[in-house]
C-alpha cells in the first residue's frame, strides 16, 4: 500500500512539472508576439523580472 501511494505522488509531481513547462513555452510565445504591438513600462519591467526568475529555476533543474 505504501509503495502504491508513493508512486502515485511521484506521477502527480511529474504531471505538474510537465504542465508548468508547457505554460512557460506558451507565455514565451505570447510575449514575443505582443512585444511589437505595445511597448509599455509595465511589460518591460515584468519581462526582466521573469527572466531573472527563469534563470534561477534553470540552474536548479540542470
From Swiss-Prot:
Keywords: Chromosome, Developmental protein, Differentiation, DNA condensation, DNA-binding, Nucleosome core, Nucleus, Spermatogenesis. It comes from the Eukaryota. GO terms for biological process: chromosome condensation; sperm DNA condensation. Residues 1-62 are annotated as: Disordered. Testis. InterPro entries: Protamine_P1. Its main location: nucleus. It is found in: Nucleus; Chromosome. One of its GO terms (cellular component) is nucleosome. One of its GO terms (molecular function) is DNA binding. Belongs to the protamine P1 family. Protamines substitute for histones in the chromatin of sperm during the haploid phase of spermatogenesis. They compact sperm DNA into a highly condensed, stable and inactive complex. This is Sperm protamine P1. It comes from Notamacropus eugenii (Tammar wallaby). The gene is PRM1.
Amino acid at each position: 500500500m505504501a509503495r502504491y501511494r508513493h508512486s502515485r505522488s511521484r506521477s502527480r509531481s511529474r504531471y505538474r512539472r510537465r504542465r508548468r513547462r508547457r505554460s512557460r513555452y506558451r507565455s514565451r510565445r505570447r510575449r514575443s508576439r505582443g512585444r511589437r504591438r505595445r511597448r509599455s513600462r509595465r511589460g518591460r519591467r515584468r519581462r526582466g523580472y521573469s527572466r531573472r526568475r527563469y534563470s534561477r529555476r534553470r540552474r536548479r533543474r540542470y
